[in-house]
């Protein structure tokens, strides 16, 4: 087992080699490693390994996730300049040159280990960097297999395979050391992991907690909205932080919406069964704090129902509960990471917005929200007022937030939540976050202004 310092030495030597690579060579590297975690047989193997090892999600969804995430990053970087001169503006005299950030420490989640690893590797190497991955202990074998596949891709094109490594020492001391000696950290995982990254003294990109919530307005295509929401919630048994945790249909379409949800495999849990479900989903943890039961995370509706001791109809894919107010007093407002969805009936859009704000202020600040509407005034209102880093309109949130062919969001599995969520950016963290940019400025005709140009209108209103 290599030490952190030994692995870092290998990474720096590998990065020094590709530091002089051309754009064409770097793009070949990205295609080489991308193919290894996009090719059908490989990703079927990785998906099966990940589900067996972690117990999270399902194989078919993880195969699709590989295609979406790795394919999306490759699409985003195709033709993009990341080596040398990347921009030149004759009018301003500004030229921009891309430089590597160096060696990146990338911390991976158990819920989405191999596709996240593949997508991140492509984006990081696009900037001529090296990366050392720290997998979740629950996903070590599957993540290591994905990394070995990509290292084989590097060898195929004659690139140093130590551009991509897995941290060999699993101890807490090793990950702490790795974070301190790396040039940049990208942390996708729990709040504890993100806080550790930000506290390391190394520049870091982290994620905030998810609790994605969507409004269904009175003008929505209700059948299509229900279909999208159910597809999103069921996908990989809701491992995605963008999977809808609550939906807020307005009263005018509530009954129709619930009927459509039933058609899409949902079952409404009520009465004593609702209480049993809640008590199964949230239990005291080792510290005595009520927390999400790890046994329900990314499990099927049937497994969750069996654990709760409730009966559900055969073929049920998603468990619904109606939300209660006050919202804080009902645990179903929380992030669930499972095919369990809370439904809140709102009087109208204004009331739906109130519920949305309260939900995301409690859990998931800055992450995301969605709306199913064609009314631009509703979309603009959310854009102006909602403290969310991304607002997804008439789309599946688990697919749309992180980039998808049907929108132009940058492809990623790392969603910044801004200062609202305790993060350094609101952006989808993607390949452009893994380059340093040098600004070269040359003299041009000077800009000038008169006092009248600058303050004329102000003086007319307030005087000098």
UniProtKB/Swiss-Prot annotation:
The organism is Bilophila wadsworthia (strain 3_1_6)
Top EC class of this enzyme: oxidoreductase
Q: Does the keyword Nucleus apply?
A: no
Say which family it is in.
Belongs to the aldehyde dehydrogenase family.
List the CDD domains hit by this protein, alphabetically: ALDH_F20_ACDH
Task: Quickly give the catalysed reaction.
Answer: sulfoacetaldehyde + NADP(+) + CoA = sulfoacetyl-CoA + NADPH + H(+)
pH dependence of this protein's activity: Optimum pH is 9.5.
Q: What is its EC number?
A: 1.2.1.81
State the source organism's domain of life.
Bacteria
Coiled-coil segments? none
The protein in question is named: Sulfoacetaldehyde dehydrogenase (acylating)
Q: Which UniProt keywords apply?
A: NADP, Oxidoreductase
Signal peptide range equals: none
UniProt cross-references to Gene3D superfamilies, sorted A to Z: Aldehyde Dehydrogenase, Chain A, domain 1 (3.40.605.10), Aldehyde Dehydrogenase, Chain A, domain 2 (3.40.309.10)
User: Known Pfam families for this protein?
Assistant: Aldedh
Active site per UniProt: 241
Instruction: Output the Gene Ontology terms for molecular function.
Output: oxidoreductase activity, acting on the aldehyde or oxo group of donors, NAD or NADP as acceptor
Q: What induces it?
A: Induced in sulfoacetate-grown cells but not in thiosulfate-grown cells.
Role of this protein: Involved in the degradation of sulfoacetate. Catalyzes the conversion of sulfoacetyl-CoA and NADPH to sulfoacetaldehyde, CoA and NADP(+). A much lower level of activity (1%) is observed when NADP(+) is replaced with NAD(+).
């Amino acid at each position: 087992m290599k030490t952190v310092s030994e692995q870092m030495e290998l990474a720096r030597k590998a990065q020094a080699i590709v530091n002089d690579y051309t754009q064409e060579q770097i793009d070949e590297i990205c295609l080489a490693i991308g193919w290894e975690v996009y090719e059908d047989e490989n990703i079927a193997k990785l998906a099966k390994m990940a589900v067996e090892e972690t117990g999270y999600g399902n194989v078919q969804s993880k195969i699709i996730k590989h295609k979406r995430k790795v394919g999306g990053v490759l699409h985003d970087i195709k033709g993009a300049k990341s080596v040398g001169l990347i921009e030149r503006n004759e009018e301003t005299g500004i030229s921009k040159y891309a430089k590597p950030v160096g060696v990146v420490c990338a911390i991976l989640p158990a819920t989405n280990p191999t596709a996240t690893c593949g997508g991140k590797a492509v984006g990081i190497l696009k900037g001529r960097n090296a990366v050392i991955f720290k997998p979740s202990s629950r996903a070590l074998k599957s993540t290591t297999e994905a990394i070995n596949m990509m290292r084989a891709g590097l060898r195929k094109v004659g690139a140093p395979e130590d551009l991509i490594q897995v941290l060999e020492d699993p101890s807490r001391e090793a990950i702490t050391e790795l974070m301190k000696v790396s040039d940049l950290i990208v942390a996708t995982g729990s709040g504890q992991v993100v806080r550790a990254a930000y506290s390391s003294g190394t520049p870091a990109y982290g994620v905030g907690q998810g609790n994605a919530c969507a409004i269904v307005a009175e003008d929505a295509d209700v059948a299509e909205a229900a279909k999208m929401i159910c597809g999103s919630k069921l996908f990989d048994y809701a491992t995605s932080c963008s999977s809808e945790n609550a939906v807020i249909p307005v009263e005018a379409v509530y009954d129709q919406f619930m009927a459509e949800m039933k058609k899409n495999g949902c079952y409404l849990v009520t009465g004593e069964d609702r209480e049993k479900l809640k008590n199964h989903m949230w239990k005291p943890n080792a510290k005595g704090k009520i927390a999400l039961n790890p046994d329900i995370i990314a499990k099927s509706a049937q497994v969750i129902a069996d654990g709760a001791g409730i009966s559900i109809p055969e073929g049920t894919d998603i468990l619904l509960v109606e939300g209660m107010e006050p919202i804080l007093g009902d645990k179903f407002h929380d992030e669930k990471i499972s095919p369990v969805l809370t439904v809140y009936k709102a009087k109208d859009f204004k009331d739906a917005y109130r519920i949305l704000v309260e939900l995301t202020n409690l859990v998931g600040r800055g992450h995301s929200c969605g709306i199913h509407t064609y009314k631009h005034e509703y979309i603009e209102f959310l854009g102006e007022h909602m403290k969310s880093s991304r607002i997804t309109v008439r789309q599946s949130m688990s697919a749309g937030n992180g980039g998808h062919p049907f929108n132009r969001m940058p492809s990623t599995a790392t969603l910044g939540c801004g200062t609202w969520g305790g993060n350094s950016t609101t952006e989808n963290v993607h390949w452009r976050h893994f380059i340093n940019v040098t600004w070269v400025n040359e003299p041009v005709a000077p800009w000038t202004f008169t006092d009248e140009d600058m303050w004329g209108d102000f003086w007319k209103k307030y005087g000098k």
